[in-house]
């Protein structure tokens, strides 16, 4: 076997042996549009990944979802912002932990992300009317690359009416 064929075979074997979701082509992930009826927030949720419903989030409206193995979770939540705080002020009042790896704050939303206990946590909140509409995702840090596309789609589809 030539070196080129050996490298191709090794690459294929690596992909086939990798844990989800590398083996799952994006077309094989089933998505649903989850809505928070009380507030109008909506987001795309990968229903073939987050297969279990969990307890409702505290302090707002929405839902929580878990993977079957419970190694990852997703919270979709609308939280009252009756004081009309800006995303920057709202985030500051939540006292985010030190060591945030990624932070972006605009007049309409914020995103923060970091590592904790071998997991990545990602939080995006969009501001509309008297609510902050948020997604919070926790997943194994060792699977970051596999989750990147899923997290991006969830984040980019968060909307409110």
List where the protein language model places each region:
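Conserved polar/disulfide-associated segments of primarily extracytoplasmic proteins
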Residues: 52-149
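Hydrophobic alpha-helix-in-membranes signature
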Residues: 18-20, 45
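Bacterial N-terminal signal peptides that target proteins for export
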Residues: 1-10
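Acidic/histidine-enriched, beta-strand-rich ligand/metal-binding domains
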Residues: 29-33, 121, 152
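N-terminal "mature-domain start" segment
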Residues: 25-58, 158
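Short, flexible, surface-exposed loop segments at domain boundaries
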Residues: 6, 21-23
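Bacterial N-terminal signal peptides
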Residues: 9-18
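Short, low-complexity, Pro/Ser/Thr/Gly-rich segments in the mature regions of secreted, periplasmic
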Residues: 147-160
